[in-house]
UniProtKB/Swiss-Prot annotation:
Pfam families: GIY-YIG. This is UPF0213 protein VPA1222. It comes from Vibrio parahaemolyticus serotype O3:K6 (strain RIMD 2210633). Belongs to the UPF0213 family. InterPro entries: GIY-YIG_endonuc (IPR000305), GIY-YIG_endonuc_sf (IPR035901), UPF0213_domain (IPR050190).
Length: 106
């Protein structure tokens, strides 16, 4: 018998020593961040530490997470900074439209 394991996917933003934000997707954020810190992740982050995991959010499917990642990568730097500052949530509706909303408290 095989047991179905529910897998969550995360989209994340990592800040490097040049203050740039890198966006990625993974099914294990702790493992992936450690890989980035060890220089075994994305080429864009190699040699640019220290790295800081600034923001992340989870999705129930890889497809949805990848759609959100694409959306974030299209944002301007200032919009990505808003995601971090506001601790915003990313949502994908039934029509596969991606949006973000603030969840910070005033």
């Amino acid at each position: 018998m095989s047991e179905s394991v529910e897998q969550h996917w995360s989209v994340y933003l990592i800040r490097n020593n040049r203050n740039a934000l890198y966006c990625g997707v993974t099914n294990d954020i702790e493992r992936r961040f450690k890989q980035h810190q060890l220089g075994k992740g994305a080429k864009a982050l190699k040699g640019k530490g220290p790295l800081v995991l600034e923001w992340s959010t989870s999705f129930d499917s890889k497809v949805t997470a990848m759609r959100a990642e694409y959306f974030i990568k299209q944002l301007t730097k200032s919009k990505k900074e808003q995601l971090v500052e506001l601790k915003a949530l990313i949502a994908v509706d039934d029509n596969q439209q991606v949006m973000f909303e603030s969840c910070s408290q005033s």
